[in-house]
Structure formats: structure tokens, C-alpha cells
């Protein structure tokens, strides 16, 4: 009776009752943060999950299973991405095992082949295959390079805080622009939605996040 009120069954990627469509990612992140300590503590379990997750992601991108759910939204098909970031950190700090390093390199090579052969040549892909593969192929070397540089750039913290707020509020910016009828030009729409999303994110940081961080810091002193 009470459990059904706490569970959302995902039957649509754009449900009419969803005020913040990207909020599904919070669920995936919470699950990942529960799983990561276990998967990183037990290395062989982590590597097994890493490969199983990538296989699920691949099956989704071939449209064998639901490409949107299992290749983009739900934890079984994306936990390998979280593990990729963790393995990058371990590689840079010299704590990664040879199997962890090799697995990350192999998956990167497979993903590069996938992009060239299946997407560019064959034109075969599922929902968000292009976006997630491109993010993976650009993100892994970029994050590795930034971790190796170990240099703190100006505005790093601010941009880091803004990024997730922009992601969560970008639909709001689309709806505002649609309401005021400013969606005719795609370039101006992208520019304006970025400004609106960044402004909303900055307000949330200033009015809520910074105050919560201050309270949290005082509690842990």
C-alpha cells in the first residue's frame, strides 16, 4: 500500500507529470554512489560489473534491448561510466591494477570502433548512442589530462557547481523560451537557454547550496 507511493515505474521518457525531466539522473547517481564503494573494494567484482554493464550498454545501442532505458538512464547500462571515472583516478594516483587499466583501454578502443563502424559507416544506433559514445570518447582522455595536470584553474569550483544545475534546469529554459515564442532560431535558442540555465543554477548555488555547505562544514568541524 505504502510502497507503491515510493516507486516510480518508468513508462515514458517524457511523462507529463515530470516537472524536472533530467531528475532521473539523480536516481542513477544515488545508486552508483551506493555501489561504487563495494565495487572498488572488491576489484574482481568491480571489473565483472564494469564489463557486464558495458555489454548491456552495447546491446541497448544495437536496439536488442530498450536503448533509452538501458543505454542511457538505468544503472545497469551506465555503471561502467562511473567506474571509468574511478579507474581514471586510480590510474593517475598509481593505484589501479593492470586489469583495471587494461579494461578501460580496451573499452575505449571498442567504443572508438563502434563510433566509426556502427554510427558513421553503418548509421546504426539507438537513442542517445551518439551522445553517450562521444561523451565517453572525449571525456576519458580529457579527464585523464586534467587529472595529470593537477592545476587548479580559476573559476574551477564555480563551473563545477554550475554544471549540474544547468543540466537540471535546461528544460525549464526551453519552456520559458517556448512560452515567450523565442524558439525560431536554434542558435539563439541555445545561447538564451544557456544564459537562463546558468542564471537559475547560480541562484540555487547562492541561495541554497552555499548555505547548506556552510552548515555541513560547521557540523563536521
UniProtKB/Swiss-Prot annotation:
Subcellular localization: Cell membrane
Q: Where are the transmembrane segments?
A: 33-55, 70-92, 99-121, 125-147, 154-176, 186-208
The way this protein sits in the membrane is described as: Multi-pass membrane protein
Which superkingdom heads the taxonomic lineage of this protein's source?
Bacteria
Question: Gene Ontology cellular component?
Answer: plasma membrane
Citing just one GO molecular function, the answer is: acyltransferase activity, transferring groups other than amino-acyl groups
Q: Which UniProt keywords apply?
A: Cell membrane, Membrane, Transmembrane, Transmembrane helix
State the protein's name.
Answer: Uncharacterized protein aq_1078
Native species = Aquifex aeolicus (strain VF5)
